[in-house]
Curated annotation (Swiss-Prot):
This is Thyrotropin subunit beta. Pfam families: Cys_knot. SMART domains: GHB. PROSITE patterns: GLYCO_HORMONE_BETA_1 (PS00261), GLYCO_HORMONE_BETA_2 (PS00689). Disulfide bonds join C22-C72, C36-C87, C39-C125, C47-C103, C51-C105, C108-C115. Heterodimer of a common alpha chain and a unique beta chain which confers biological specificity to thyrotropin, lutropin, follitropin and gonadotropin. It comes from Bos taurus. Residues 133-138 form a propeptide. The gene is TSHB. The lineage of its organism: Eukaryota, Metazoa, Chordata, Craniata, Vertebrata.
């Protein structure tokens, strides 16, 4: 290997480790309401990935806000609305969900993000699914 090639490899690896990998990622969610007959499968995008972080020494001497870590969160997003099939007339069949347009590494904003990691898997259907999916166009 030449010295130039070797140096460019080392530089590439160093920059790759220093840069964050936080991007919109395809995500399939299942939505159902107990009053409705069907479960709806929605394809959307969410922010997922790795953000550079570090643990601080001297935690006892720092204020709590200085101890928070960056997470992969929304920079720009929009809401879309889907209709859950098989709902009776007295039930509103609409469900709004976020679609990530761009992402960033930053503090988790509870105004529009769920900042708690759930240990229980809840993304499944207990009712029959309709044969169509809402979301990505092919």
């Amino acid at each position: 290997m030449t010295a130039t090639f070797l140096m460019s490899m080392i530089f590439g690896l160093a920059c790759g480790q220093a840069m964050s990998f936080c991007i919109p990622t395809e995500y399939m969610m299942h939505v159902e309401r107990k009053e409705c007959a069907y479960c709806l499968t929605i394809n959307t995008t969410v922010c997922a990935g790795y953000c550079m972080t570090r643990d601080v020494n001297g935690k006892l001497f720092l204020p709590k806000y200085a101890l928070s870590q960056d997470v992969c969160t929304y920079r720009d997003f929009m809401y879309k609305t889907a209709e859950i099939p098989g709902c009776p007339r007295h039930v509103t069949p609409y469900f709004s969900y976020p679609v990530a347009i761009s992402c960033k590494c930053g503090k988790c904003n509870t105004d529009y993000s769920d900042c708690i990691h759930e240990a229980i898997k809840t993304n499944y259907c207990t009712k029959p699914q309709k044969s169509y999916m809402v979301g990505f166009s092919i």
